[in-house]
Amino acid sequence: MRDMEMRWAAPAPAARGRGRARRRAPDQPSFSSTLLDAICDSMDEGGEDGRTRNAASAAAKKRQEAANSYHYYYCYKPSLAASYRAAPALGSTADCPGRGYFSSSEVEYSLRRLRPIRTSAAGGAGDGAAVARKQRHEQPDVEKTAKTKPGSASARACRRPASPGARLASLLNSIFSGKRPSAQRPACSPDYPEPACSTAPPSSSSSYARRPCHAKTPRTPPTTTTTARARPSRSRTVRFLDIDGKVAVAAAVAGCRRIPVMEVEADTDDGGEESSDASSDLFELDSLAAIAPAGGRDGSYGDELPVYGTTGVGIRRDIGRRRPYGHAPCRSWSRAV
């Protein structure tokens, strides 16, 4: 028993001195034991190297995050987006930022192009004086360019698209300003005098009687030595025709002929059976045969069917008489065409 205790307790000091005992069989070491021994050795021997490696990876990660933040700030800022697009691509097609990849060389190039923004007045009065002198030196050049190219600023302003708000504001200003464009009359040329307007006195029934005609005296052209002959002044006369007057007078002057127009006056009796237009008039053949026998006066109504509206007794008598042209019941009048 004591020998067994001595055998188990003997390798303990060596294990404490080495740190961890290697569990390895002297004859046939297994794969798991070999892997475990390698892991333990790497942890014991490379403790300090692992710490430095972790610190280096953390620093590299921080630098990468900072570069990414600068990259996205520079790309999505509206004032710098155009310059970023115009910058030449330094990397390959795989490093193109449009495809979602990132290139540190592009970020360094873009960051070098950024200008520092001064946020505090720590520069002192010397820097302000230098800037003022620089502006004074640059001002004559600006004035010269403005004089040589007066239309460049206006053309640049015209190329800018107007926003809807600006258009609405200009429209409201033009409405409420109260300035209306004055109607400019075209200037008459001195060679051709303005014609005078003379009107004939129209009748009282004319619709144009109350419209005055502005008569102006012809302007005398200026006498110059270059004009060979003076042009005579011509006057034009405007006359208004009386619309409501007698048209027959104008027609007679124009040589129009009269065409007679007949207007037949129909005798209408309310409630009379003779002028009835009902369908029962078609069945009055017996009474009509008694009044106008077969053959009639000229034998024209014997075997005919009655016509609608002509089966009355009085109407058939009137038709049989055949009144001459211009009889009393008819009224004739003439119309000029």
From Swiss-Prot:
Gene Ontology cellular component terms for the protein in this record: plasma membrane
- GO BP, sorted A to Z: auxin transport; auxin-activated signaling pathway; positive regulation of auxin mediated signaling pathway
User: What segments bear the compositional bias annotation Low complexity?
Assistant: 150-163, 195-209
Quote the biased-composition stretches of kind Basic and acidic residues, using this chain's numbering: 137-146
Q: Where is this region: Disordered?
A: 1-32, 120-163, 179-235
Source organism's superkingdom? Eukaryota
UniProt entry keywords in alphabetical sequence: Auxin signaling pathway, Cell membrane, Membrane, Transport
Where does the record say this protein resides? Cell membrane
Give the family this protein belongs to, as stated in its UniProt record. Answer: Belongs to the BIG GRAIN 1 (BG1) plant protein family.
Q: What does this protein do?
A: Involved in auxin transport. Regulator of the auxin signaling pathway.
Q: What PANTHER family does its record include?
A: PROTEIN BIG GRAIN 1-LIKE (PTHR33541:SF9), PROTEIN BIG GRAIN 1-LIKE A-RELATED (PTHR33541)
Name under which the protein is recorded: Protein BIG GRAIN 1-like
* Species, as recorded: Oryza sativa subsp. japonica (Rice)
